From Swiss-Prot:
Recorded family membership: Belongs to the plant LTP family.
Cystine crosslinks: C28-C76, C38-C53, C54-C98, C74-C112
Protein's name according to its UniProt entry: Non-specific lipid-transfer protein D, cotyledon-specific isoform
Known role: Plant non-specific lipid-transfer proteins transfer phospholipids as well as galactolipids across membranes. May play a role in wax or cutin deposition in the cell walls of expanding epidermal cells and certain secretory tissues.
Taxonomic source organism: Ricinus communis
Top-level lineage group: Eukaryota
Record key words, sorted: Disulfide bond, Lipid-binding, Signal, Transport
Signal peptide: 1-24
GO molecular function, one term: lipid binding
Classification of source organism: Eukaryota, Viridiplantae, Streptophyta, Embryophyta, Tracheophyta
Length: 116
């Protein structure tokens, strides 16, 4: 009986931890919405990031509460960049142009799992 209690307790604790982790991560829909105005510059169609791009990314940066959030944002951006034709030579310039510190290299080649 004692073993069953501890097994159930462990399982519930584990599930609660998973729920907290998944709630903490920034959803891709939010990332896509906030970064949408940056696509023109990131694909080379616009000569500089728009003010809407910078505002969206600043708002996105304010949602970051943890390393898991940074990793989630990185994964979302990488996934979107493949389908949108994002070019690294433009993408990497966005943080400086928008005066945003992201804490990791902005590139389609970034290994999101190494972000800390």
């Amino acid at each position: 009986m004692k073993n069953i209690f501890f097994s159930v307790f462990f399982l519930l604790s584990f599930l609660l931890c998973l729920a907290n982790v998944s709630e903490a991560a920034v959803p891709c829909s939010t990332v896509d919405m906030k970064a949408a105005a940056c696509v023109g510059f990131a694909t080379g169609k616009d000569s500089k990031p728009s003010s809407a791009c910078c505002t969206g990314l600043q708002q996105l940066a304010q949602t970051v509460k943890s390393v898991d959030d940074k990793k989630a944002i990185c994964r979302c951006l990488k996934a979107s960049s493949k389908s949108l034709g994002i070019k690294d030579q433009f993408l990497s310039k966005i943080p400086a142009a928008c005066n945003i510190k992201v804490g990791f290299p902005v590139s389609t080649a970034t290994n999101c799992e190494t972000i800390h």
